Amino acid sequence: MLLGCSAGGFNLVFELIRRLPSNFPLPVVVVIHRSRNYPSSIEEILDKKSGLKVVLAVDKEKLSKGYVYFAPSDYHLLLEPDGSFTLDYSEPVLYSRPSIDVTFQSVADIYMDKIVAILFSGASEDGSEGMLYIEDKNGLVIIQEPKDAEVKIMPQAALFKCKDALVLTNDEIFAFIDSIS
């Protein structure tokens, strides 16, 4: 499962991660826009509150069920065909590194129609191309209802591009996650 957000989406994504049970059937990859200038203990805090192991993705680490992987600040997070991560320092995409688009497209190339991707609040259009790419691979694309988003730009951009996306309220997103647990 892929989760992406920027401004206004952090609290909702963190709440979703806190609610994931230890038997959640999918590995989770999270891309949030965060500054490289400020050290963060997001993973450490969430690890204590989630039923899953919450970690910062490490280069060459294999994607595994039972884990939530956060893309590190200032690196694009890619998934290789062997299921391992690569940290990439190429140019920012839409002023963002990590880029939601880059990670979502990379994972879609491997898992295609087996992907569930959810895009939340954000102040850029990053994520919209990745969601379209996943939709084109027949993955399940879920967009936060823009009316529920603190910053509507990101979900609106994805909604404009994705014609088959599920558009869900915050409560509906939680209910959906509960249904696959």
Summary of predicted features, one role per range:
Residues 1-181:
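Conserved acid/base catalytic micro-environments in cytosolic active-site loops
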